[in-house]
């Protein structure tokens, strides 16, 4: 057994060969233990109480936000915890559904996960915006010429995967982001499959939204599994999402 697999309790059963990490990774012992320790010693609602436990839980929660920000080189205030990458995309699409007008265009690619396909399709249906998908070639590469042909001043948002969850193809997102910004379009990048395999610097990428899910790189699966990095605070005033208790 290699040194990495030794960190994962599930692989103590040496008959297991797990090839579905693109959907969700197994969890290392340190992550499992941290979760057990938190539930055993520190559990309380965050940002909602004044007792010692609540203060400790809130501090741990915000420490996690800072670690995420450091990991992807993002301003900590731009990090939003969500239920998953799917909810992150839906949150952005929900905001755009209130901004799009008849004749506006949304551009994605044919290689998108359904989570980055259906929300934009539905957002366009709500208000008569035009939904466009860039072709992929026979070897799975995004067709750059088709991207350029379908990109226009009418394009309001470009939503693309960084790395395909099916094909493993890495899109040239730096070039695509620049092309989109040149026509005034915002860009959302789905980094769910790239986050575990390459360094990510969202400020260098210069995208407007970057989403990923912790479960794709050995994080626990819980009610705050997703990460959304955003650079347009005003934009989110358009999105009504959730409810429940509030705080000033």
PLM segments and residue spans:
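Pyridoxal 5′-phosphate
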Residues: 1-248
């Amino acid at each position: 057994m290699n040194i990495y697999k030794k960190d994962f309790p599930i692989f103590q059963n040496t008959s297991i060969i797990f090839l579905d990490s693109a959907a969700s990774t197994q969890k290392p012992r340190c992550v499992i233990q941290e979760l057990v320790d938190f539930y055993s010693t520190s559990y309380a609602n965050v940002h909602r109480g004044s007792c010692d436990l609540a203060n400790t839980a809130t501090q741990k929660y915000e420490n996690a936000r800072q670690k995420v920000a450091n990991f992807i080189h993002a301003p900590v205030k731009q990090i939003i915890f969500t239920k998953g990458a799917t909810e992150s995309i839906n949150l952005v699409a929900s905001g755009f559904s209130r901004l799009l007008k008849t004749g506006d265009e949304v551009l994605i690619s044919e290689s998108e996960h359904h989570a980055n396909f259906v929300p934009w399709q539905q957002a366009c249906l709500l208000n008569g915006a035009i939904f466009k998908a860039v072709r992929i070639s026979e070897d799975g590469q995004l067709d750059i010429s088709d991207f350029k042909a379908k990109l226009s001043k009418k394009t309001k948002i470009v939503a693309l995967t960084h790395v395909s969850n099916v094909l493993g193809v890495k899109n040239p997102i730096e070039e695509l982001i620049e092309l989109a910004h040149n026509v005034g379009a915002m860009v959302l990048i789905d980094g769910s499959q790239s986050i575990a395999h390459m360094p990510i610097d969202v400020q260098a990428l210069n995208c407007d939204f970057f989403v990923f899910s912790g479960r794709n790189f050995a994080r626990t699966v819980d009610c705050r599994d997703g990460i959304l990095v955003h650079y347009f605070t005003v934009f989110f005033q358009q999105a009504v999402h959730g409810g429940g208790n509030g705080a000033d």
